[in-house]
Amino acid sequence: MKVRPSVRKICENCRLIRRKRKILVICTNPKHKQRQG
């Protein structure tokens, strides 16, 4: 899980999800997991 000031999709399988005011990126590739905060 990478914590970044700006999250974005890295590949086609990445999905942006908003959960409890946090923006997450969930992907089939575990390296692409990101969280904003």
Curated annotation (Swiss-Prot):
GO terms for cellular component: chloroplast; ribonucleoprotein complex; ribosome. This is Large ribosomal subunit protein bL36c. It comes from the Eukaryota. The lineage of its organism: Eukaryota, Viridiplantae, Chlorophyta, Ulvophyceae, OUU clade. The keyword Transmembrane does not apply. Keywords: Chloroplast, Plastid, Ribonucleoprotein, Ribosomal protein. InterPro entries: Ribosomal_bL36, Ribosomal_bL36_sp. The gene is rpl36. Its main location: plastid.
